Amino acid sequence: MHAENSFVIDDWYPVGALAETVSGRKYHTRILGTEIWYQLADGTVSAGLADNTAELASKSIYGLLWVSLSDNPRDVIAIPEFAEADRRVVSAGSIRVATSGLRVIENFLDMAHFPFVHTDILGAEPLTEVAAYDVEIDEAADEIRAVNCRFPQPKGSAAASEPVEMQYVYRIARPFIAILYKTCVIDANRLDVLGLFVQPVDQESSIAHTIMCYLDDINTDKQLRDFQQRIFGQDIMILINQVPKALPLNPRHETPVRADALSSAYRRWLNDRNVTFGTTRG
């Protein structure tokens, strides 16, 4: 049994996009309610507690700067696609959201809202049904995957020129990290990778760092960024109006609907790992 919140304390958290970080400038932010600083200088990341009583582990990978509060953090998750030379790694920005980071992740996993929130982009009426998909627990990696996900989308990516039934694989790698592998319209034999890396600022606020790892020789970085920011911008009003802001982990709050199978698995997974930060059990 995990000690309360050890599963989140012993992890790494993004604090900024590498492309948007000014070298030599000292930044101040919070992780899990703890005030910290970080800096990029001569290609090296450094970080510490805001009161300068301790240095913190830090690194740069996947287009982000990362910091851990732990003296012995586990490894950063592996995303092999980032090492593929023909992929574009583009930041879609770091957006502050006035809700628990776990809420941000759960919203990312939800396909049911596509036709109603992302109308004529990720979905459209009357095609509103979420087809059955499979949820798998990878015991060795301690991750959740949803496979065989599919949804008809009018414009499933910035590169899409016509409607297509997008194929999705969701990977919940850590409580505050979810990776989406989706149909690549440029290369049918490979998948685009969209990473949502959430920085839990405190119990009820977070910063969503989104990184695209795409096979796209059509769009500029700005066009890729604009497309993804439009999608996230449509989600903001939903996220900030959710009550409570913390993610409910009491089983009575779960809705046993097929479309919510991944969300239910995510909540149980958090509960089983004694994650209480950013949650409520009321």
UniProtKB/Swiss-Prot annotation:
InterPro entries, alphabetized: Cholesterol_7-desaturase, VanA_C_cat
Keywords recorded for this protein, A-Z: Alkaloid metabolism, NAD, Oxidoreductase
Enzyme class: oxidoreductase
GO biological process: alkaloid catabolic process
Lineage, highest ranks first: Bacteria, Pseudomonadati, Pseudomonadota, Gammaproteobacteria, Pseudomonadales
One Gene Ontology molecular-function label: oxidoreductase activity
Role: Involved in the caffeine degradation, which is the essential first step for assimilating the carbon and nitrogen in caffeine. Probably catalyzes the N7-demethylation of 7-methylxanthine to produce xanthine and formaldehyde.
Protein name: Probable methylxanthine N7-demethylase NdmC
Annotated EC: 1.14.13.128
Catalytic activity reported: 7-methylxanthine + NADPH + O2 + H(+) = xanthine + formaldehyde + NADP(+) + H2O; 7-methylxanthine + NADH + O2 + H(+) = xanthine + formaldehyde + NAD(+) + H2O
One of the Pfam families matching this protein, by short name: VanA_C
